[in-house]
Amino acid sequence: MKTYSSYVNFLCSLMAIDIPDICYCFKEQYYDVNGFDVEPFEMESHCKSHVIPDENRVYVNLNEMYGENDIYFILAHEIRHCAQYQATEGIGLTDIALPETIYKWKREFSRYNPCCNDESCQEVELDAMAFTWFIGKVLLNVDVDLNCDEALVEPYKQYIRRNYSLMEIKERLDYSGLEFGRNQA
């Protein structure tokens, strides 16, 4: 059973956030990021994941994934939502986004629905998509298809590219013990 704990540690270290509780479902097994059994949870069958930001909790349905990269992208996206919420609560780095963006996130999280509904025009979704794109590009050397209007995501991509240096990424890789991606970074 794979837990992706080094990858989760890398993402959380990079964004300087509290590590979320991550629960996986795979072939009727339910477990956490440490491999311990957790209470079974329900998700819509087509959902790959959902996040409960105010509980700092992520649920991942590994049965719906198309491969390892899909899992890495989903975890990056959902953990970014945790970072966004923590930023609205004053936890983590203050430079995760501009203050006006964090204010918009706070408003959106007050109405946030963690289900699989398409909320792709929300600031929290655009930023999470841009972060996923960034992680795909930097760690996996893959262009992530975001299935959205590139013009909407581009400002977030620019901010994220400026916010994380190559040196910082390499340091966080070393710190987390994450093995893959060293050649790309």
Regions found by a protein language model. Give the residues of each.
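Catalytic Zn2+-binding segment of zinc metalloproteases
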Residues: 79-96
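Hydrophobic (often cysteine-bearing) scaffold residues that line and stabilize catalytic clefts
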Residues: 4, 72, 120, 124
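Active-site scaffold of zinc-dependent metalloenzymes
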Residues: 35-69, 82-86
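Zn2+-dependent metallopeptidase catalytic core
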Residues: 1-21
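Short, solvent-exposed loop/turn segments at secondary-structure junctions
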Residues: 29-31, 65-66, 90, 136
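Metalloprotease/metallohydrolase-associated module, dominated by Zn2+-dependent proteases
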Residues: 93-179
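Non-catalytic terminal regions of proteins
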Residues: 22-39, 57-62, 73, 172-175, ...
